[in-house]
Design a protein with these regions (language model features):
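Short, glycine-/small- and polar/acidic-enriched structural segments
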Residues: 11-154, 160-164, 168
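Short, low-complexity, disordered segments immediately C-terminal to signal peptides
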Residues: 1-15
Length: 168
C-alpha cells in the first residue's frame, strides 16, 4: 500500500515526485519523514513525497534496487550483505536511527520476564538473518543453547503470531 502525504498546496506547484518505501509499518523511526512532509519542507525543496508501505520484509531493498522506488528505509547490515553477497546495486545515504530498535516482547500471560525464561519457548523474529543472529546471541548470553528454543521467522507478523499462539 501507499499514501500520498504531500499537502494540498503541492498540487499547484511543479514538484518532482519521490517514492519512499518504509522498512516496516509507520512508526516512531519515521517521525522525521512525516513531520517534514506536514511542515512542507519537501515542497519547499521542490519534492512531492509518496510513502509506500512494504508488503514483506525485503520490499525496501528489492523495490529500490529494481528501480520501482527512489528511496528505501532498510537496515544497514542488510544493505552491506546485499552489496557484498548478492551484488545488489544500492547504497546507504543516511541513518534514520542511531541505534538498533529491536526489543524482546511477549504476552503477559506467558510469564516471560527474562531471556532465560525463553527455554522451551517458540521465539518469533522479523525476517532477516541478522535478527535471527540477535536472538541466538541473546540466548547464548543468557546461558541457553540454540536448541533450547524454537526460532520462527514470522516476517511482519510479530504481533499476530503472538496473539494466535504461533510463537510465545
Amino acid at each position: 500500500g501507499s499514501t500520498d502525504v504531500s499537502s494540498a498546496s503541492g498540487e499547484a506547484k511543479n514538484l518532482e515526485e519521490v517514492s519512499v518505501v518504509l522498512d516496516w509499518y509507520p512508526n516512531g523511526s519515521h517521525v522525521f519523514l512525516y513531520d517534514a512532509i506536514e511542515e512542507g519542507y519537501y515542497e519547499e525543496e521542490g519534492l512531492k513525497i509518496k510513502v509506500e508501505f512494504p508488503s514483506n520484509t525485503n520490499d525496501a531493498i528489492s523495490m529500490t534496487s529494481a528501480g520501482k522506488a527512489d528511496i528505501g528505509f532498510y537496515y544497514m547490515h542488510d544493505v552491506i550483505q546485499a552489496n557484498a553477497n548478492q551484488n545488489i546495486p544500492v547504497v546507504s545515504i543516511g541513518a534514520a536511527v542511531q541505534n538498533p530498535v529491536n526489543v524482546l516482547m511477549s504476552l503477559g500471560d506467558k510469564n516471560i520476564k527474562t531471556v532465560a525464561d525463553l527455554k522451551g519457548k517458540k521465539i518469533g523474529y522479523g525476517g532477516s538473518v541478522l535478527n535471527e543472529a540477535f536472538v541466538k546471541t541473546m540466548l547464548k548470553n543468557a546461558g541457553l543453547k540454540e536448541d533450547d528454543a524454537e526460532l520462527i521467522d514470522v516476517g511482519f507478523e510479530l504481533m499476530s503470531s503472538m496473539t494466535t499462539g504461533q510463537v510465545d
